[in-house]
Amino acid sequence: MSGGKYVDSEGHLYTVPIREQGNIYKPNNKAMADEVTEKQVYDAHTKEIDLVNRDPKHLNDDVVKIDFEDVIAEPEGTHSFDGIWKASFTTFTVTKYWFYRLLSTIFGIPMALIWGIYFAILSFLHIWAVVPCIKSFLIEIQCISRVYSIYVHTFCDPLFEAIGKIFSNIRISTQKEI
């Protein structure tokens, strides 16, 4: 193994491999291999969802959390029969629960489809139209900003500096006459 050449068991000569540590995608180095296996990429399309906590970012805490007590309340001194109050509570709660389930069954998947398309369009436009347009504008505006900077430093700075020197020697004194 001298001069950058390797000899295999059959006596054939070959050049030094480009990377002796192994394949750049599957390293032979054990420590390197452990680092690669530790870094797992999580795909947003295959992640598991939490069926218990369905609002982990608390988007709807102050808007949708409406209970019976938030909508219907009887002030002190004006109470209906206890049975009516219990039946009203049960009716409200069960109706809200099942009607929400019915609406989400009928409209949930179509609305998810519509919002998925909408946000896909927004993402597409942002990635392929908005950001390139802004970058293009910033590149084009640099030329104008350089010309403007030269104009300001050449004409405006000396003019305003001269005006400042003229007015810097003006002294105002006030006197009170009684």
Swiss-Prot record:
It comes from Mus musculus (Mouse). Residues 2-94 are annotated as: Required for homooligomerization. It comes from the Eukaryota. Its main location: Golgi. GO terms for molecular function: ATPase binding; identical protein binding; inward rectifier potassium channel inhibitor activity; molecular adaptor activity; nitric-oxide synthase binding; oxysterol binding; peptidase activator activity; protein heterodimerization activity. Residues 82-94 are annotated as: Interaction with CAVIN3. It is a peripheral membrane protein. Homooligomer. Interacts (via the N-terminus) with DPP4; the interaction is direct. Forms a stable heterooligomeric complex with CAV2 that targets to lipid rafts and drives caveolae formation. Interacts with BMX, BTK, CTNNB1, CDH1, GLIPR2, JUP, NOSTRIN, SNAP25 and STX1A. Interacts with SLC7A9. Interacts with TGFBR1. Interacts with CTNNB1, CDH1 and JUP. Interacts with PACSIN2; this interaction induces membrane tubulation. Interacts with CAVIN3 (via leucine-zipper domain) in a cholesterol-sensitive manner. Interacts with EHD2 in a cholesterol-dependent manner. Interacts with CAVIN1. PROSITE patterns: CAVEOLIN (PS01210). This is Caveolin-1. The lineage of its organism: Eukaryota, Metazoa, Chordata, Craniata, Vertebrata. One of its GO terms (cellular component) is focal adhesion. Residues 105-125 dip into the membrane without crossing it. The modification Phosphoserine is found at S2, S9. Keywords: Acetylation, Cell membrane, Golgi apparatus, Isopeptide bond, Lipoprotein, Membrane, Palmitate, Phosphoprotein, Ubl conjugation.
